[in-house]
Amino acid sequence: MEAAAQLLKLGHTPIIIEKGDRLGGHVARWHRLFPDLTPAGELIDRLTEACKEANIFLNTEVSLVNRLRNGYNIILSNGITISTKYILMTTGFKMFEASKKEEYGYGIYNNVVTNSDLENWFNGNKDERIDSSSMKAIGFVHCVGSRDEKAGNGQCSKVCCITAIKQAI
């Protein structure tokens, strides 16, 4: 969304193709952002407003991209074909399925949640797994699914540590 907003400032009309029913991806479900604890909703609202002149397709995915001599044809899941000279593709990310690491008890015990689950709960959404009345302390386990060859992901996600610090604040 930030890239689209900047392209609009430069006089271009970007096309945003969002597979979900609203803009913002994962951030739209989060509570506050690091380092200044800005409410995530404020950022999403600001970027949505900044992108209002873009062509936006919600609940849509890119089905096929064909390279042409002077550009691309993009076929969308809704049947629309777009011809363009340039593509800036931002694919987002998938959260690691924490239940794959059974040793941490996610999906087995209450009060064992991911950073994303906790953000969603902080944002006022109910989560039956979280019982704040029984909590005396909170521990954060870093790198679950990241830097883990057995889980198929040897890279660091670059967000777990900073998110845990923000949530601890």
Map each language-model feature to its residues.
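Rossmann-like dinucleotide/flavin-binding elements
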Residues: 1-24, 65, 91-169
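SH3/SH3-like beta-barrel fold
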Residues: 73-76
